[in-house]
Amino acid sequence: MVKPKIIAEIGCNHKGNIEIAKAMVSTAKTYCNVDVVKFQKRDIKSFLSTNESNSPHPVAYNSYGKTYGEHREFLEFSIDQHKERKNHCDKIGIEYSSSVWDLKSAL
């Protein structure tokens, strides 16, 4: 019988901070014994319409920018930061995964 893989969905709960993201990976590995961590990747300009991007965050208290677009951009990591997280995962022995929300992010 094949053992199922346990995946920890980290998504954007790292608050746009690479060190928080890496700490979440380490915590998932150490305390939850998961096999895989999963993040998300979006190209905000592909993902949001101009109107959505320029609108305020629906819950201003939780926003990392003046607009929803700025908020979403703040939470996104660059390709180099994705590589840094992948290297951290390799170092501690956990699989890295990222779901993409648009074609540009997949390329």
Which stretches of residues belong to each language-model region?
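Non-catalytic positions within long, well-ordered alpha-helices that form the structural scaffold/packing
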Residues: 29-33, 90
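Active-site beta-loop-alpha junctions enriched in small/polar residues
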Residues: 11-13, 40-44, 101-103
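Conserved, mostly hydrophobic/aromatic
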Residues: 9, 28
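Glycine-rich anion/phosphate-binding loops
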Residues: 15-27, 79-80
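Glycine-rich, proline-tolerant flexible connector loops at the mouths of alpha/beta enzymes
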Residues: 35-76
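Hydrophobic faces of well-ordered beta-strands that scaffold small-molecule active sites
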Residues: 6-8, 35-39, 96-99, 107
